[in-house]
Amino acid sequence: MHPAWFHIENEAEIPSPALLFYRSRIEHNLKLMIEIAGGDPKRLRPHVKTHKCAEIIAWQVQLGITSFKASTIAEAEMCAASGATDVLLAMPCVGPNAHRLAELALKFPQTAFSSIADAEDSIRFLASAAQQHRVTLGVYLEIDCGMARTGKLFAMQHYDIDILFISSFGCFRLSIR
């Protein structure tokens, strides 16, 4: 059996439940992430849904990790408030959430916000919100690569049509990777 790597000295004084950080272990893991990414923190976009913690995001930013993926508008806001310069909302942004994302772009102009899109309707919702709030948002076209889980079924013959459709709104940052 392995010895305990996390020992609390004053256990009786800590209210329960409580969120406890083992800082040296977290910092070790963050540095290992960067090492696995070839030493370049700009190659990373960690998902915050697993910890939902501003302090951990701030530690990542201090190490040069500035791009993040979020599952909710609240997580996206937490990332921006913690120093993120690039936040991807990992879901199509429709209805009120499209406006909330555009409002975040106004509130945090130093942060580039993006959302995924898998259908023309989600692109229209996002475009409408971006235009109404006079901001530029990023859009990632989610592609169904054959698993039939999420995304738009990719057909090379329609690729240029998708790009033209997205760019026609004039309010998106569009990058092809």
Give the ranges of each region predicted by the language model.
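Short amphipathic alpha-helical surface micro-motifs
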Residues: 1-3, 27, 97, 122-123
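Generic N-terminal amphipathic, Lys/Arg-enriched alpha-helix
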Residues: 2-21
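N-terminal glycine-rich anion-binding loops that anchor highly charged ligand groups
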Residues: 2-6, 25-56
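Generic structural "secondary-structure junction" signal
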Residues: 16, 21-22, 50, 149
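Short, surface-exposed alpha-helical recognition segments that flank or form part
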Residues: 21-24, 114
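Active-site-proximal beta-alpha core segment in soluble small-molecule metabolic enzymes
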Residues: 47-177
